[in-house]
Amino acid sequence: MAAPHRPGLRISSGLTIPEAELSWRFSRSSGPGGQGVNTADSRVELLWDAAGSSALTPHQRERILDRLGGRLVNGVLTIAASEHRAQLRNRDAARERLASLVAEALRP
């Protein structure tokens, strides 16, 4: 289970995205899930402003904007997760996806 207090999203030993730079949106998820699927906001969207991030060096920012340019809208990367019935699990899945995507984009 995830820790309730997170100082940030660790991408690598040299890069952690501060929690304050991560924004969340919640909505109802579609698909199976029983009665709760229509009443619980279990779908999550994690937004991170890569273009304006204070965590990145200029080189890292340039590489991310170049490699993830097709996924960015006005410099903001959005990750959606709705595969789990619980919002907390979807939040964790979105965080893991963001970390993986950014780490892959920063690889030489």
List each language-model region with its residue ranges.
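Ribosome-associated translation termination/rescue signal centered on the conserved GGQ peptidyl-tRNA hydrolysis loop
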Residues: 1-108
